[in-house]
């Protein structure tokens, strides 16, 4: 109704076409968020929209996230896929040169567009789509730096959501059935997340088995005008 965006079956279900008015709003939001992440010590990077399938084999996405990925395309005998997440590309940037512990923490951020297969029945406006741009970030740090970096990230997210006036709840999502890594590593990571939240007086709920295949996570659930919760940052 506001002529901000549309979808078109010729383009494909779950893919958003941004109209001029919507593009203005999106650009203003991205400018604000870019200023915010730079203020919080992040550096900007860019990674390709598609990558060699081998990258997603190494990262574990093909084994653990394949049902949410689009199919492979073959070019000159090599297989490529649209990226479902930005993390493999950020890790490749980190690994592109020798690093010292003195360089850490390194905080990388990207407005990265990703593509995920969602069943047509669960697509919902702009809230559940097949292609979307994340204000994504990855922090490379030593184990000793983890608590401080989690705290800094909590500050960043709170500042952003408070600026936009979103009430939110926090959920600590734990190890899913299908997961990489030793269970004791998961327990350690989950304990650090819980400890930092408690130290900062942040109320949270436990989402048993709701973590990503590669690690536990904090889910910020945004609450809309009629009380529904939506996946946030």
Question: Model-derived features: where do they sit?
Answer:
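Auxiliary tRNA-acceptor-end handling modules of aminoacyl-tRNA synthetases
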Residues: 1-123, 127, 139, 162
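Conserved alpha/beta enzyme-core scaffolds, especially Rossmann-like or related mixed alpha/beta domains
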Residues: 4-20, 128-184, 208
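Hydrophobic alpha-helical membrane-association signature
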Residues: 29, 149-153, 189
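Surface-exposed charge patches
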Residues: 35, 159, 195
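Active-site proximal loops enriched in glycine and acidic residues that flank catalytic Cys/His/Asp
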Residues: 49, 84-86, 113, 136, ...
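Short acidic-glycine loop/turn motifs at beta-strand connectors
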Residues: 74-77, 141-142, 223-227
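Active-site-adjacent "gating/activation" loops or surface patches in catalytic cores
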Residues: 117-120, 228-232
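Metal-assisted phosphate- and nucleotidyl-transfer catalytic regions
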Residues: 162-231
């Amino acid at each position: 109704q506001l002529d901000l965006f549309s979808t078109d079956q010729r383009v494909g279900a779950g893919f958003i076409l941004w109209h001029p008015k919507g593009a203005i709003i999106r650009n203003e939001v991205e400018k604000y968020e870019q200023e915010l992440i730079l203020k919080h010590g992040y550096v900007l990077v860019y990674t390709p929209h598609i990558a060699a399938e081998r990258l997603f084999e190494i990262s574990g996405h093909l084994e653990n996230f394949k049902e949410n990925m689009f199919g492979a395309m073959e070019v000159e005998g090599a297989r490529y896929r649209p990226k479902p997440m930005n993390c493999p590309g950020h890790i490749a940037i980190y690994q592109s040169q020798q690093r010292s512990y003195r360089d850490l923490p390194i905080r990388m951020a990207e407005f990265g567009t990703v593509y995920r297969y969602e069943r047509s029945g669960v697509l919902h406006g702009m809230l559940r789509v097949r292609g979307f741009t994340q204000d994504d970030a990855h922090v490379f740090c030593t184990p000793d730096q983890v608590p401080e970096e989690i705290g800094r990230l909590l500050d960043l997210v709170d500042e952003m959501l408070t600026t936009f006036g979103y009430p939110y709840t926090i959920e600590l999502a734990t190890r899913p059935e299908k997961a990489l890594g030793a269970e004791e590593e998961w327990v350690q990571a989950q304990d650090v997340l819980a400890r930092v939240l408690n130290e900062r007086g942040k109320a949270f709920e436990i989402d048993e088995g709701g973590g990503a295949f590669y690690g536990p996570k904090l889910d910020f659930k945004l609450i809309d005008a009629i009380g529904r919760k939506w996946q946030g940052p």
